[in-house]
Amino acid sequence: MKVLILGAGGLTGRYLVCESKRRGMEVASFTKQELDISKTDIARDTLAKERPELVINSASLTSLELCEENPALSRKVNCEAPEAWAKECGRAGVRFVHLGTDYIFDGKKTSAYLPQDLPTPLSRYGKDKAEGEKRVLRANPHALVVRLAWVFGHGGKTFMSKLPGILAEKRVVELAGGRTGSCTYAGEASRIILDLAEKRVEGIFHGVQAGETTWKRFAEKAIELMKSEGRSVVCEEVRELSQDKIPGLRVPRPAFSPLDILETEKILGRKIPEWEKGLVEYLREIGW
């Protein structure tokens, strides 16, 4: 099978390329520099040239602050482009997978969010991602949307991805508090996405690892694991701060946004590993 991966230069995209090749798939991958999905008119020509059987869109404008500053670009990348690709894939008989986010919710629920829960976004990013999901499924009812959350992995720009290096260098680590959610090692996320695609399911599914956590709990678990392997850990204290004290975090995030994975596990016929196991896998990958 040939798979075309959009946003292949991003964290999840890179792992999707590796996992697809590991499964023996033929891969056509495009980074943001190689294929700008905001140019929606190139979808048809790209499909005709590459002739894939599956397209996975991992391209997204994920900076909440940038989305607020440039709403037109956010709408183009997170909403209009996925719709265009979903429509063209439907026309060409190509399966289409689009990646979503927990940030479409406001965090006011007291239990994990279900795939069918209605979006209640707090930010421009969340609004456009929610509208993007809606448009994708309207343009192509056979499309698959897989929601991810707090993704971490090698070479990632996210705080969780950078955390092991920070713990090895700083005595006091300050991070955003007051938030609980699901997290996902990018390697496991890529396995879930491809497993769901191979099952030929459609609609909305959640692709996170089992359990919920906070950034502080994640950091403390990383310290525990690193020390158990005899790795150098300089950090002596993990300190939670309110979001308004964290430089660069100007846009509200949901305070509670775990994603329920029961339906995903039913379809896959397996239990998805807890996030702690994903952290172990990640630390081993980077040699910590």
At which residue positions do the language-model features occur?
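N-terminal Rossmann NAD(P)H-binding glycine-rich loop of SDR-like oxidoreductase domains
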Residues: 1-22
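Adenosine-cofactor binding site in Rossmann-like domains, unifying the SAM/SAH pocket
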Residues: 21, 26-45
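NAD(P)H-binding glycine-rich loop region in Rossmannoid oxidoreductase-like domains
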Residues: 40-79
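Catalytic helix-loop patch of NAD(P)-dependent Rossmann-fold dehydrogenases
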Residues: 69, 76, 80-84, 104-146, ...
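NAD(P)-dependent short-chain dehydrogenase/reductase
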Residues: 137-191, 195
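Substrate-binding strand-loop-helix patch
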Residues: 154-155, 179-188, 208-225, 281
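Mid/C-terminal beta-alpha module of Rossmann-like enzyme folds, strongest
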Residues: 192, 199-249
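Conserved C-terminal active-site "lid" loop/helix of NAD(P)H-dependent oxidoreductases
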Residues: 214-220, 241-282, 287
